Regions:
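Aromatic- and acidic-residue-enriched segments that line the glycan-binding/catalytic groove
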Residues: 32, 53-56, 101-115, 152-210, ...
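Short acidic catalytic loops
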Residues: 88-96, 112, 145-154, 237-238, ...
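Active-site-proximal helices and loops of the catalytic beta/alpha 8
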Residues: 133, 240-243, 247-314
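Short, acidic/polar
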Residues: 70-82, 228-248
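N-terminal structural segment of carbohydrate-active enzymes
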Residues: 2-145, 155, 214-216
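N-terminal module-boundary/linker segments of secreted carbohydrate-active enzymes
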Residues: 1-40, 152-154, 166-168, 173-180, ...
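Short, solvent-exposed turn/loop segments enriched in Gly/Ser/Thr/Pro and often Arg
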Residues: 41-43, 92-102, 148-159, 258-263, ...
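Extracellular/periplasmic catalytic domains that process cell-envelope and extracellular macromolecules
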Residues: 28-33, 84-87, 92, 133-141, ...
Length: 314
């Protein structure tokens, strides 16, 4: 009889020791050789077989903007053949973690330690990764890698400023904290610390420091990831969270969201520690890449190179 263990709720609950008896997946194929298929989980497919819609028919029913449509992890597992037939060798998943209501895209996270029920379960994710790693095409091994989209710059809209007002960045001023929107979120519980957030209000200048590294992206609350004791606590917690998901799901890489809004040192520490942990599991080719959207070459240059240009971390 299989006993399902509850999801952890604290950093202290996370077991990062390799799963006994498990051989973690590794393939020495160059990442530059991969053909990566990106999909938004909710918009891809569920596990139900459907005919292709014709004319004005909609295979997913009535379209409701800014809401979930029903795609899930089992639907991806069921359609690995389709992805392989396109010639793809790796799958990049949108964030799988539990989100606030209506956040079908996955970037409004309120629980980093559990899979969003709209998408399935942790076991569904494990099964998908296992199926991708062991996939066969035309009777021959065709291992596909799986990449998770991860967020380390901000949490979801899990708390509000005092008075419930909408604050905007101004002269790097810290604004007063109101309260968390739910008594049981965010998770892990360590994220229920108002000092772990910059609290500068919404940014309007997305390309110039310090606003672009201290301000909130719309309602998403920016983590305090500066080079100080608080920032070290935040980034260390995020490192452990994502090491946990490598251990549990055996994923092969991370795409890091909103990199230009993260301090260079925090980004370097995260990247180096993630790669080192993956290596201890035998995953020698763990891949990390990040999102930078900017017209400024200077911003790109700050994050290019081994561990970035400010990688003097201890």
């Amino acid at each position: 009889m299989e006993i399902l263990m509850p999801d952890p709720i604290s950093i202290g609950d996370l077991d990062l020791v390799p799963i006994p008896g498990k051989t973690y997946f590794n393939i020495d194929r160059e990442w530059r050789e991969e053909f990566i298929y990106f999909l938004l989980i909710d918009r891809f497919q569920d596990e139900v077989s459907r005919q292709i819609a014709t004319g004005s028919a909609r295979s997913f029913g009535v379209v409701t903007p800014n809401n979930f449509y029903g795609g899930n992890i089992k639907g991806i597992t069921r359609n690995l053949e389709y992805i392989a037939r396109l010639g793809c060798t790796a799958i990049w998943l949108s964030p799988v973690f539990e989100n606030n209501p209506g956040a079908y895209h996955g970037y409004d996270i309120n629980n980093y330690l559990g899979v969003d029920p709209h998408f399935g379960t942790k076991q569904d994710l494990i099964d998908l990764v296992d199926a991708a790693h062991s996939f066969q095409k035309d009777g021959h091994p065709y291992p596909m890698r799986v990449i998770l989209d991860v967020v380390i710059n901000d949490s979801g809209d899990n708390w509000f400023y005092r008075g419930g007002f909408r604050y905007f960045y101004f002269n790097d001023q810290i604004f007063p904290f109101g309260d968390f929107r739910r008594p049981d979120r965010p998770l892990p519980i360590e994220l229920r610390n108002s000092d772990w957030y910059h609290r500068r209000g919404e940014m309007r200048d997305y390309d110039h420091a310090p606003e672009n590294q201290h301000g909130d992206i719309l309602a998403l609350k920016d983590y305090a990831n500066d080079d100080d004791p608080i920032g070290s606590g935040v980034i260390n917690a995020l490192i452990k969270i994502y090491c946990y998901w490598i251990r549990e799901a055996d994923v092969d890489g991370f795409r890091v969201d909103a990199v230009k809004h993260i301090g260079e040192l925090a980004c370097a520490r995260f990247s180096s520690n993630i790669r080192e942990y993956a290596y201890t599991l035998g995953k020698r080719q763990f891949f990390l890449f990040g999102e930078i959207a900017s017209p400024s070459d200077d911003i790109y240059n700050r994050y290019i190179g081994q561990n970035t240009s400010k990688a003097g971390w201890q």
